[in-house]
Amino acid sequence: MTNITLMNQLTPKQIVEKLDQYIIGQTGAKKSVAVALRNRYRRQLMDESIRDEIIPKNILMIGPTGVGKTEIARRIAKIVRAPFSKVEATKFTEVGYVGRDVESMVRDLVEVSVRLVKEEKMQLVRVKAEKNAEKRLIKLLAPSQKKKQTTSQNPLEALFGGMNQPDESPEEEVDQELKNKRSQIEWRLQNGELDDEIVTVEVKEQQNPMLDMMRGAGMDQMNGMQDALSGMFPAKKKKRKVTVREAKKILFEDEASKLIDADELAAEGIHRAEQMGMIFIDEIDKIASKEGGGNAQVSREGVQRDILPIVEGSQISTKYGTVNTEYILFIAAGAFHMSKPSDLIPELQGRFPIRIELDKLTQEDFYKILTEPDNALIKQYKALLKTEGIDLIFTKEAVERIAEIAFQVNQDSDNIGARRLHTILEKLLEDLLFEAPEINMESIKVTENYVNEKLAPIMQNKDLTQFIL
C-alpha cells in the first residue's frame, strides 16, 4: 500500500488518534502535524495549475527536551510510510568550513525515500525473486561437475572482482543423478530441513572503508567521488560461508534487485522525497544568534543562511538525480531556553509560519506515559522479565509513586521530560534484572513500599539525585 493511499484513508482526527497510541498529551502539536499531512494529500488532488502554488507550511515546535517533539514527527512518518530524516542543526557548519554540509540532510532524505520505494518494489517481485533465489541455492548445494572443474580466472577479473560466475546454461546437459539430487534438495529446502547447513555464496564487497571513514568525519563532498569510483569498475565480490537461512535472504535481495529497474527506482524515490518527504531539524535553537556573541554567533548565523535556501526551495544534486526541496515539509524543534525564536534570522523565521509550544509534562502525564501507550515502559520491562519466566506486576500505587518521583526530580534538577522515567525505572529494577535468571519465582509484585525502599535514600540526598536519577 503506497503512502498516498494511506493518507487518503486517514483523516486528521484519525492521525491524532494513532499518535495518541504512542504519545501522551501535546494535542496542539499533533493537530498541526496531522493537518499539514492531510494538506499534502489535498494538494495531490488539485489541478496542476494551482498545485505548484501550494507549498507546505513548515512547523516550529518549541518545548523542553523529552516532551515528544521528535517522537511526533517520527511516528507520523511511520504511520504513512513517508520518507523521514532527522538531523541536528548543531552538526552543520557554514560552507567553506570542515563539518557536515547542510545539503546532506536532503541527500539523507533521498536515501530513505529510495529505500522505502525499493522495499515496496521488492514485495511486488517477491514470488519470482524467491523462485530464482531458490534455483540458485539448489545449484550451490548441488553444483554440476563441469562447474566444479572451472577454476581458471582471468588476472584482470581477479583484480576487479570478476563478474557473476554464470550458472550452467539451459542447454548444458545435467545427468539424471544430479537431477534427482537437486530434486531431493529442493524438497528438503522447502521444508526447512537445510536451514542450518553451511553454504558458500558470493556477496558484494562493502565500499572502500577509507572513503566511508572520510565521509563519517563530515566530508560530505566525498559522496560524489565515492559514487564516481564505484561506477568505474564492476562491483567486487567476495565469497562468504553462511547458513542456508542467511543465503536465502542474500540471494533473494540479489535476485529482487535484478528484477527492479534502477532508473525507475531512482525517479520514484526522488519524486516521493520531493512530494512526501519530511525533514526534522532538531536543536535549531542552538544556532539562533544573539547580539554581541562574537565569531561563534557569526558562524551560527552562517549555518542559518545556508539552511534558508533549502527550506525556501532549491535544487540539490544527489547520486540519484536532482531534488527540488520546495515541497518538502520541514519541522524544526528546539527548547529555546537560552534564546527565543525571534533570535533566528528573520528570513528563516518566516519560513516556519506554524509555531507550536509543547507543554511541560505533569505528574498525571508521567502516569499515563508509564501505562497507556502501546510501547509503554512498564510493558517493556514486563516483556523483558517474561523471557526469564517471571510475571512482573506493578500496583497502581507503585506506578503513581514512580510518576511522582519523576516529576519531582525534573522540578528539582534539569527537566529532561519523559526520559527521566528511563533512568528511574532502570535504577528501580536494577537488582531484579541482575538476579532474574536465579530467581525461582513465577511472579514479582512491585509495590509502593518497594519503590520507596529502592529510591527514597537517593531522593533524600539531593547530590545523589542529580548524579543518579
Curated annotation (Swiss-Prot):
GO terms for molecular function: ATP binding; ATP hydrolysis activity; peptidase activity; proteasome-activating activity. It is found in: Cytoplasm. Keywords: ATP-binding, Chaperone, Cytoplasm, Nucleotide-binding. InterPro entries: AAA+_ATPase, ATP-dep_Clp_protease_ClpX, ATPase_AAA_core, Clp_ATPase_C, HslU, P-loop_NTPase. ATP binds at I24, G66, V67, G68, K69, T70, E71, D282, E347, R419. GO terms for biological process: protein unfolding; proteolysis involved in protein catabolic process. It comes from the Bacteria. It holds the Pfam family ClpB_D2-small. Its main location: cytoplasm. CDD domains: RecA-like_HslU (cd19498). GO terms for cellular component: HslUV protease complex. Gene3D superfamilies: 1.10.8.60, P-loop containing nucleotide triphosphate hydrolases. A double ring-shaped homohexamer of HslV is capped on each side by a ring-shaped HslU homohexamer. The assembly of the HslU/HslV complex is dependent on binding of ATP. Belongs to the ClpX chaperone family. HslU subfamily. ATPase subunit of a proteasome-like degradation complex; this subunit has chaperone activity. The binding of ATP and its subsequent hydrolysis by HslU are essential for unfolding of protein substrates subsequently hydrolyzed by HslV. HslU recognizes the N-terminal part of its protein substrates and unfolds these before they are guided to HslV for hydrolysis. This is ATP-dependent protease ATPase subunit HslU.
